[in-house]
């Protein structure tokens, strides 16, 4: 049996709409995509391996160019054949939801892996390790899964006509979109429709997941990120619908927000982040009945709210957010506005613990200064050799997403520490010299020394992003902010 025949059999056995009667039709659909020359054999009978073989066959037959863009587009067209139509998938999802929310998400998650929408093979390349810090074990990841952009492809994409469709990579217009040079293939992409606050939203998984069951909840309308009462209501509504998932929103301002501020969306999933394990350092009273509140022992300034009353919980979140938006304290460089520009917002995260709903509200400030041009509450220059990008939702919760360059760069730091010939980049010199001076380095412990040091740098990164520091001045300033909520 050829790889093409095996693939057709897999399509018929898949959750798609095809049956044995459709075999000839599906065979001809695949032939049309890959060409009529002899199919290249697959390395095994896994669906992804069969797809790889058919993509190579298409290159051999001159149907596509041997470029990442062409290969991705064809692979996703093939995987579309094993994927139910959006209407069918949505019906099945909500049918399974009647059994339990987890039954529904398990079905959708497994399907999104099986059809290679979630790039499990690429994600497996990521480097992940824990790091002990004064704030508990942080999670360090070096992100190797997202493909590097080919300079030639970037140049070619610049010459492509831009018709603004899809409007952005989070729009529902991406569902089933073929893709093009410089824009990802989405033929096998599916979105579950749900209602939040009376509006239609979508639920999908992230193709390059940063944690288990990494989900995206997106507004059907293309409108900018905003944090307000509706945000808190929506987050709690999602946790009501999917109590086994947490969900949070990136902040709605540059520097402290995520990389996609143009389309309202949230991220969630099934993972207990370090911040969720962090204890309450001291309780506070917000004057809202039925809501417990406390300052979390965490490098970023966080107030944890707990209640079974969703309206009271939302009221408490709004009180913190609205007070913070207009709150300044010059003694600790906290300024709500400069020259009419707003600097304050929050990063909210919701989850359910037993019968309680929990909202963590993280205070954010995106000011810049002559001393800190990238951001006063952003990784400072001396830690930017490890992390200089924005501190978004996932990192706020204690999971570092570090750039791919670090895999090779840290290997060279290791050689330097062992006095071996190396090509260590200059920006790591001061840090590496300090590691050398303060540790007895051996071949057996060099990796542990570096991993621990990277973890400590990430803890410092989070501390830089925290508006109220864990010193006497910072804690007194935090208490003044809490008092301001009673004014």
From Swiss-Prot:
The subcellular location is:
Cytoplasm
The protein's UniProt keywords, in alphabetical order, are: Carbohydrate metabolism, Cytoplasm, Galactose metabolism, Nucleotidyltransferase, Transferase
Q: InterPro entries in the record, alphabetically?
A: GalP_uridyl_Trfase_II, GalP_uridyl_Trfase_II_CS, GalP_Utransf_C, GalP_Utransf_N
Write out the pathway annotation from the protein's UniProt entry: Carbohydrate metabolism; galactose metabolism
Q: Which reaction does it catalyse?
A: alpha-D-galactose 1-phosphate + UDP-alpha-D-glucose = alpha-D-glucose 1-phosphate + UDP-alpha-D-galactose
Principal location class:
cytoplasm
- Family label: Belongs to the galactose-1-phosphate uridylyltransferase type 2 family.
This protein is called what? Galactose-1-phosphate uridylyltransferase
Q: Which organism is it from?
A: Lactiplantibacillus plantarum (strain ATCC BAA-793 / NCIMB 8826 / WCFS1)
Taxonomic lineage of the native organism: Bacteria, Bacillati, Bacillota, Bacilli, Lactobacillales
Encoded by which gene? galT
